[in-house]
Each structure stands twice: as C-alpha cells, then as structure tokens.
C-alpha cells in the first residue's frame, strides 16, 4: 500500500520575527523553514557549530558541502537540496558521518520523485543530489 501526501503552499509573504529558546534543534528547524519561505528574522538563534553550518550550507552555491559530524544537518540538507534547487550538489561529512545510514530518508525522498545517488557505499553518505522542484 502506497500512501501519498500532497503538500501545497500558499504564496503569501511572512512578515515578523520569531523568538526561540536558543536551542540548536529549534534553530536548525527554523532555518530550514525560513529557507523555504520569504525571509523572517529569528531572534536568539543558536551559536552552535551545527547551526552555523546550516546557515552557510543553505546560503552556499558550492557544489560540495561538508557537514562534518552534523547528523541533523545531513538529513535536513538532503531533503532541502533535493526539493528546491535545480543544481547538482554533493553532500558529504566526516569519516564517522559516512558510516551513518541514511537510506530510510533517501528512499522516502526518491519515492517522492527526488534524484539522489550514493557516491560510495549504498545507503550511506556521501550523496549526489540532483535537485528539482517537487
């Protein structure tokens, strides 16, 4: 049985700011939300390395992005780069990151029409992501 979810977006601008607790988890989720929408200000954004990495990766035009040890960034950016950009990107990480499975997410994204390839070991980063609007 295949379950299909349809997500649509309204084309309205968001204005204002969001004040958060400063946690890395909240910060990274809101950065991704902001990347999908019009700009809004996030107050009390975490200054963690993972959050700084998310900011630079979202804003980057580089073809290869290294997330180091940041597992949340690897997963969030896999979905983000798969779904919005019409560019090819390589998403990689540390030696340890390349030992962490990511096939459940990649399989789900492929089922939605995303174009993702494993560059080394099947089921693990690094990934080549050929982005497209889904």
Tell what function each PLM region has.
Residues 1-134:
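Structural preference for solvent-exposed beta-strand-turn elements
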């Amino acid at each position: 049985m295949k379950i299909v979810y349809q997500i649509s977006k309204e084309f309205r601008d968001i204005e204002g700011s969001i004040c958060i607790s400063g946690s890395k988890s909240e910060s990274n989720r809101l950065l991704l939300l902001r990347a999908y929408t019009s700009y809004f200000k996030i107050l009390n954004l975490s200054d963690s390395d993972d959050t700084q990495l998310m900011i630079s990766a979202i804003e980057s035009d580089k073809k290869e992005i290294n997330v180091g040890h940041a597992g949340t960034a690897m997963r969030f950016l896999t979905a983000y780069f798969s779904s919005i950009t019409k560019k090819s990107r390589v998403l990689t990480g540390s030696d340890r990151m390349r030992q962490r499975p990511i096939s459940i997410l990649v399989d789900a994204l492929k089922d939605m029409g995303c174009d993702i390839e494993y560059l080394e070991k099947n089921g693990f980063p690094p990934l080549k992501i050929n982005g497209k609007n889904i």
